[in-house]
Amino acid sequence: KILDFEYASILIKLVVMWYVLQVFLSIIALLVKIFRLIYEKTSGTKVDESRRRFLHGVVWVPAISATLYGGLYESRNIEFVEQDIDCSAFPKLNGLKIAHLTDVHLGNFFSVRQFYEILNEIAHKAPDMLVITGDIFDSGKINDEAIKILNAFTPYFPFGVYFCWGNHEHIRGIKHLQEALSKTNIKVLNNQSIKILSGDKPLYLLGVDYVDERGGQ
């Protein structure tokens, strides 16, 4: 299933990139035409046709470059950032590793295969827990498959996998996602907290819903 969607995703990605490119070119062509009309009207001379044809050819370069950069490079340029936090006042937290994943936006530009690869890379870093702060499940066609993949990785995180909603989960159908996630080992924190470590200085994890989807409440 992952392979089938991967091929379909590539085709859809190319189509979307083509339309984005057309939008870029249309905007640039319109700006060039406006500039030419203003120049001719204010200067009283016509623009050199050979130069105009050259400029029309040149405008393709930034448009194509921007489209390819956003569609191909950025969607695959995954950056892992490691941050050490001083926990000297909380000895129990020393050595605790928390992985944080957010804004993957699964869909045409980010496949379930890439999602699997990211989770696999995170698991190899051996964190104690994984916290996911929304905007992951952004495609109705592959959300269920992505949830299954995420659930399969839960044994790799001893303290658990925790999730809170982003606005794109609300957009894609929060009720279906709630039902699907309820059947997994992924813990959804919807304006809730959970105690991770007990003792005199316990550690709580709080998950907050996306505020704008609740009318600011």
Annotate each predicted stretch with a short phrase.
Residues 33, 40-41, 76, 137, ...:
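Charge-rich, low-complexity amphipathic helices
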Residues 38-58, 71-100, 107-120, 124:
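N-terminal signal-anchor transmembrane helix
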Residues 89-217:
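Soluble catalytic domains of enzymes that build or remodel membrane lipids, polysaccharides, and related
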Residues 62-68, 81, 169-171, 186-189:
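Short amphipathic alpha-helical surface micro-motifs
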Residues 1-75:
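Non-catalytic terminal accessory segments
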